[in-house]
């Protein structure tokens, strides 16, 4: 572990030698009483294996490299619209069928993440009409990114989608139906 003056802390894994860089900013109290929001971010260094990453509070940047990687979203704060998560960025999300593409990634939500949404690890586009009440994907061709948005209670209190995850470097349109057919979104 080492710390530098610019707020970066680097931890080196004893297992694989890959580095994980953390950027931590704390709340600052000033004489005028201003209390800026704290920010906690981390970058996961890429590996060549099938990694499982558990998302935490804060705005995380994830780069996983080769392999079929899974990002898991658990409930950190049941009263929060995004279950306690910030807006994460996955820099190298592999879009494709998990059955045929060894680099296709998976976004997994815990069964408690959504209220009244079926828990099924084998979701497909046949579930689209139910899933799209809780999950929305907006593709932006200008930035080549797809934003995964969530509404944890579906239509219960009206539609109120919140940005959860930005899939960067997506050169073609990414849709919820395709993510479901590719088995890249799972629940449970």
Language-model segments: residues:
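Acidic, glycine-rich calcium-binding repeat modules characteristic of RTX/beta-roll
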Residues: 45-127
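Low-complexity acidic/polar repeat-biased segments
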Residues: 2-45, 104, 129-188
């Amino acid at each position: 572990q080492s710390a530098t003056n610019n707020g970066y802390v680097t931890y080196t894994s004893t297992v694989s030698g890959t580095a994980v860089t953390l950027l931590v900013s704390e709340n600052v109290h000033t004489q005028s009483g201003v209390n800026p929001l704290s920010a906690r971010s981390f970058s996961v260094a890429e590996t060549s294996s099938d990694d499982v990453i558990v998302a935490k509070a804060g705005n995380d940047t994830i780069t996983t490299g080769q392999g079929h990687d899974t990002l898991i979203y658990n409930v950190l704060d049941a009263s929060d619209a995004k279950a306690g998560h910030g807006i994460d960025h996955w820099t190298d999300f592999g879009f494709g069928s998990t059955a045929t593409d060894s680099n296709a990634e998976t976004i997994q939500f815990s069964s408690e993440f959504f209220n009244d949404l079926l828990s099924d690890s084998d979701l497909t586009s046949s579930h689209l009409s139910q899933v799209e009440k809780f999950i929305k994907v907006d593709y932006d061709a200008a930035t080549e990114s797809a934003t995964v948005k969530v509404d944890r209670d579906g239509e219960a209190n009206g539609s109120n989608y919140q940005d959860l995850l930005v899939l960067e470097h997506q050169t073609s349109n990414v849709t919820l139906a395709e993510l479901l057919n590719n088995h890249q979104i799972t629940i449970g």
